[in-house]
Amino acid sequence: MTEPLKILVVEDEALILMQIEMMLEEAGHCVVGTAMTAREAIALVHETRPELVLIDLRLGDGSSGLDVAQAVRDLGGITAAFMTANAQALSEDMAGATAVIAKPFTGTVLEESLTYLEDCVRRPPPTESVPPGMRVAPAWLASFAQMRAGSTPRQGPRRS
């Protein structure tokens, strides 16, 4: 088995947060932190340096997962993915996140999405096709295509 991904989970609903945390740990990953607000999440990103941040788009305290994604993007070197039932609310660039996982999702959908995201983090470009229930940002798909063609280093799209 490969080394577990270090994952930070940002979700404002406690029961959903616990369920996601349990699913991640059962899949063999390491949850390095959980946050229910953007402020907590941004502090934990700096403190824990996760490899992957799973972010709910709408947070209950009035903050937005977009704020978290922007902080992750600014820090660099960390992959972000949204989890939301409202994927159409995201702009095409997904605020710099790699992907969005549609809620509600099953354990299978989450596990397949994590396999894809693990390849994004550790072995880009992913060799698997995008799993059902997940949408990848067009800039990331283009970057992966360039990597496969050998015309770009193995990293995601340039951050502006």
Identify what each model region corresponds to.
Residues 11:
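Conserved acidic carboxylate
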Residues 14-33:
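Two-component/phosphorelay signaling modules centered on CheY-like receiver
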Residues 21, 34-52:
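Acidic, metal-coordinating helix/loop segments flanking the phosphotransfer/catalytic sites
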Residues 56-57:
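Active-site residues of response regulator receiver
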Residues 63-78:
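Short amphipathic alpha-helix used as the core "switch/output" element in two-component signaling
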Residues 83-84:
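Hydrophobic/aromatic residues positioned on beta-strands within the core alpha/beta folds
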Residues 103:
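A Lys-centered signature of the CheY-like receiver
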Residues 112-115, 119-160:
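CheY-like receiver
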